[in-house]
Amino acid sequence: MSWFDRLRQGLSKTRQQISGTAGPLDQEVQTAFTRIDNIEDLEYALIAADVGRAATEEIIEDIRKNGEGRLQDALMRALTLQLEPNARRAQFRELGFSPDVSRSKVDPKGHVVMVIGVNGVGKTTTIAKLGQYYMERGQSVMFAAGDTFRAAAGTQLGVWGERLGVPVIQGVDGGDPAAVAFDAAGARKARGTDLLFVDTAGRLHNKHNLMEELKKVRRVIDKADPGEPAEVWLVLDAVTGQNGLQQAKKFHEATPLTGVVVTKLDGTAKGGILVPIVRELGVPIKFIGVGEQPGDLQPFDSQEFVRALFDVELPKA
């Protein structure tokens, strides 16, 4: 099964949430918007899918001002633009160009990627999948088991490392995460490894001391390897919906994010949460996940996502 087919299948719950409550999407925009109940149904469907009230209002206004042809086509266009954090790229999309530029954006700017997120989002497994993704594209990879507070985390990453043939820098359970990060950053620099993924503890976003520790980890990485980490990626579980967005805001305040990885999109009807993440943080979504297999985590592309959401085939190359 192709990635697009897996994505389409994984977004089925969100698709049902929107199509089941939005009313008929195959009617003309001008016809649909003559009835207030059609507009209200569409608003309700988008908000229920966790698109967010502010983004929903913008989408409705966009359709009202610019929408021609079928309502579904206008809705897809408006959603695609909402998912573009880069205004220039959004303009290209609007003009009808669809260059595959968003996929190239997943190449890390530097050599160290700090991966953060609360417990239960699949952070350690996501790191393993990311490692495999970049190895398959010719990059050398290292892992740092910086989640020293969760007893099994280091062991789990170690098992993944053995399976993938990736070196793993580990500390002791309950040890200093910053020390692990410092040693790993120094080792990566000495060995000339292309990419180091630093796992971190599953921090609760309402615990000030844990957020402060994140800042410390970032500082010591920079001390061991100046200019790093060039990337800080937050892993979010799509099932958490709006609560996940609040998590993202707290993490972004503590240590500015450069990207978000959204997992478990196949387990929720709230796939619309991607819209407020991009809109309110201005941070790109790097990867999305719709399953347990390594190939079920792939670079995010807004046009591909929206087409899969509405079960519309990709245009022929």
From Swiss-Prot:
It is a peripheral membrane protein. The keyword Acyltransferase does not apply. InterPro entries: AAA+_ATPase, P-loop_NTPase, Signal_recog_particl_SRP54_hlx, SR_rcpt_FtsY, SRP/SRP_N, SRP54_GTPase_dom, SRP54_N_sf. GTP binds at residues 117-124, 199-203, 263-266. GO terms for cellular component: cytoplasm; plasma membrane. GO terms for molecular function: ATP hydrolysis activity; GTP binding; GTPase activity; signal recognition particle binding. The keyword Lyase does not apply. It catalyses: GTP + H2O = GDP + phosphate + H(+). PROSITE patterns: SRP54. It comes from Deinococcus radiodurans (strain ATCC 13939 / DSM 20539 / JCM 16871 / CCUG 27074 / LMG 4051 / NBRC 15346 / NCIMB 9279 / VKM B-1422 / R1). It is found in: Cell membrane; Cytoplasm. Signal peptide: none annotated. It is an enzyme of class 3 (hydrolase). One of its GO terms (biological process) is protein targeting. Its EC number is 3.6.5.4. Involved in targeting and insertion of nascent membrane proteins into the cytoplasmic membrane. Acts as a receptor for the complex formed by the signal recognition particle (SRP) and the ribosome-nascent chain (RNC). Its main location: membrane. This is Signal recognition particle receptor FtsY. Keywords: Cell membrane, Cytoplasm, GTP-binding, Hydrolase, Membrane, Nucleotide-binding, Receptor. It comes from the Bacteria. Belongs to the GTP-binding SRP family. FtsY subfamily. Part of the signal recognition particle protein translocation system, which is composed of SRP and FtsY.
